[in-house]
């Protein structure tokens, strides 16, 4: 399915797309040991080959533009904690966790790190700028992978010009003293101010009734938005 998506981009967008396995990347860039930084070094290889000092702007058509990770990740890459017992690392790609891992609100897993390709980048995720777009399909099975690729290709081939293509949805809950809702609202306001052509929808969990079910808590009304 990864190759099927790559071929769709080659055909429709004229992109040069490489499909590689995680083991291939580990073998070349981390001596065969699974390491999230190996993904970054892999992309930096293409980046360094394209960038000639003093001609970055003129070499832009040769620079790598995107990295798509085809697999889910876990905060416990080694899967040695009880939360991940029973899972196989072979079914996941790795994720990069921030340096501060002692506080839940300051520790996070991010793929942004993989897009920091300049020589001086990587020491500060807060201030370094990404050089490529990084995305991830958080799939764990072949069925999930096929579904994601089917949806993506359907989106690429959809020629219907309607308002749905201009819609942006911000979803947040009230955890961590409303931090997530505050950040979502800041981003939504920035989009409305700088890109008025977009239709911004907000779905904030705390604005809906909290219902308890046999499987846990949910905001049923929010799922209908």
Q: Across the structure, where does each feature detected by a protein language model lie?
A:
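Cysteine-dependent hydrolase recognition
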Residues: 1-225
């Amino acid at each position: 399915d990864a190759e099927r998506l790559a071929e769709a981009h080659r055909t429709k967008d004229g992109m040069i797309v490489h499909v590689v396995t995680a083991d291939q990347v580990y073998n070349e860039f981390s001596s065969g040991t699974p390491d999230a930084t190996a993904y970054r070094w892999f992309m930096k290889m293409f980046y360094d080959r394209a960038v000639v000092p003093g001609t970055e702007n003129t070499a832009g058509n040769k620079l790598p533009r995107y990295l798509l990770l085809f697999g889910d990740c876990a905060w416990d890459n080694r899967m040695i904690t009880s939360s991940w017992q029973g899972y196989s690392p072979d079914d996941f790609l790795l994720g990069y966790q921030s340096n501060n891992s002692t506080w839940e609100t300051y520790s996070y897993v991010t793929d942004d790190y993989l897009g920091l390709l300049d020589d001086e980048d990587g020491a500060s995720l807060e201030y370094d700028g990404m050089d490529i777009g990084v995305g991830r399909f958080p799939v764990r099975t072949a069925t999930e992978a096929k579904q994601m690729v089917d949806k993506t290709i359907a989106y690429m081939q959809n020629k219907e010009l309607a308002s749905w293509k201009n819609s942006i949805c911000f979803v947040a809950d009230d955890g961590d003293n409303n931090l997530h809702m505050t950040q979502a609202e800041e981003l939504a306001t920035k989009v409305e101010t700088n890109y008025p052509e977009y239709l911004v929808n907000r779905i904030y969990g705390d604005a809906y009734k909290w219902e308890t079910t046999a499987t846990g808590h949910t905001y049923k009304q929010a799922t209908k938005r």
